[in-house]
């Protein structure tokens, strides 16, 4: 799905769907990342090529590379009215995609009205289970950032059936990751594209605008909630802390 954004009075079509301001989103993280967020008043933006998922920013699988290049060749051939397409043009397309991937910094959120057990297990599993989630809305996130950045939904696709173009690649993921219901922020360096960019960037935020409430892992011990409350107090952030509702006792 696509939407439009307005920049300096000009309307541009996006290659992603933009969540409405009242869309509920969550940021799940371990305690260290939570403390870093509070200490720096900034979101940690990971470079796209540093994610564990090797398909982050990919246009196709390696085994489909020949077919992908043939499709590119066909596209440019039509564009050039049947003239021979220089090999360099195809190479430049791949270089442009790798450069954009290397200069894109991402921060990922989960979209949903309720908590996700799958996300808790990703970020707060193990013996200590010291995980934290921030609940907010897309509108609050925009206000907290205070400047224009790209915020959009991920579209989950089957790479054996469709390939994203260079602009779409960072807004597409494999269908196996659909459980993430991801909304992401993307920024690029202000200085422009570089072949030697920083490994991460920090995006300043207003914490009181950003955080609606804080939740602690359903696997965490009861004392952990008090620890999180003390940490918030230390950084002068007055927000409610809840123990995850997924730990409620069942009646049979």
Where are these regions (language model features)?
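Partner-binding and oligomerization surfaces adjacent to conserved cores of proteins
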Residues: 1-252
